[in-house]
Amino acid sequence: MEDVKLAVDTGVDGVDVVIGTSSYLRQFSHGKSIEEIIELAQTVIEYLTKQNVEVRFSTEDSLRSNPEDLFRVYEAVDKMGVHRVGVADTVGIGTPRQIYELVKELRSRVKADIEFHGHNDTGCAIANAFAALEAGATHVDTSVLGIGERNGITPLGGFIARMYAVNPALVAKYHLPLLMHLDQAVARLVNVDIPFNNYITGFAAFTHKAGIHAKAVLNNPSTYEILKPEDFGLHRYIHIANRLTGWNAIRHRADQLGLQLSDEEIRRITEQIKAMADTQQLTLDEVDRLLYTHEQAVNGNVETKTITDQPVHLDV
């Protein structure tokens, strides 16, 4: 109770009460029985409901708790008047199906809002969070870049991507271009890198490299993109300086540079790029110089222009 009173004294408008209900936490953490948990919850909740604050009660390690014990606790605190109950997959053991079934059953038993908190130890945090929403949860815990204990929790960017892919209207109220700035700010403050394959904000998120992909994306980006980078204030990038590049991507680059090269010449240049990339790392500048060299050989001297500040950004 001392911690609860201290929290209220700070002037907060909501208090989150958490206690473990699994046999692991009951035996090796706080040592309380289910009956004692309910008694303690009643003491705390009765006090909080008189303080004009929002009350959230969450079990910890919900997925490894005995279902009968779990629902007994939830139904008890719901009757006590909590505003929200929380389901916590504390060790990331749950699967989307398990989360869906648990939250659906809980939804049928309590009137309070339902919040889901999922850890990512087994890589299911995003899928589990969305399954919880589908089953009737009203709130989902996320963190920027998924930062949290061990492997972290549901990442904000990944969850935004999941909802956007289902229906962009689900995230229409958010200013999506801020996501990149938010990820960058947090990464800088905690001294970590944004993973190259991070949802939305990783540098590879909208990068296309293989020739077959590049050709299709040039024709219609939806062939290999479920998210529209422009909706997040970003651009797609066709990476052409590699051995997997295709002639369609090289053609697009030549057109960007204003070069007049036939398809046969473009195909020949593409094969040369592939061969060079097998033995050395190429830069976009080197590819451009190769294109200009061929242009000069075919059509005479031409004035070169540099657009490497905007390398193959495609808004198509």
Could you describe each region identified by the protein language model?
Residues 1, 22, 62, 92, ...:
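Short, glycine-/Ser/Thr-/acidic-enriched flexible segments
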Residues 1-114, 129-137:
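Alpha/beta enzyme core
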Residues 8-15, 23, 41, 45-52, ...:
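Structural signal for hydrophobic packing residues in well-ordered secondary-structure cores
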Residues 20, 61, 90, 120, ...:
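Residue-level "edge-of-site" marker
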Residues 23-24, 64-65, 93-94, 123, ...:
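Short secondary-structure capping/turn micro-motifs that flank functional sites
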Residues 31, 35-38, 42, 67, ...:
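Electropositive phosphate-/nucleotide-binding environments in soluble metabolic enzymes
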Residues 94, 98-225:
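Catalytic alpha/beta core domains of metabolic enzymes, predominantly
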Residues 168-316:
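A mid-to-C-terminal "edge-of-domain" accessory segment
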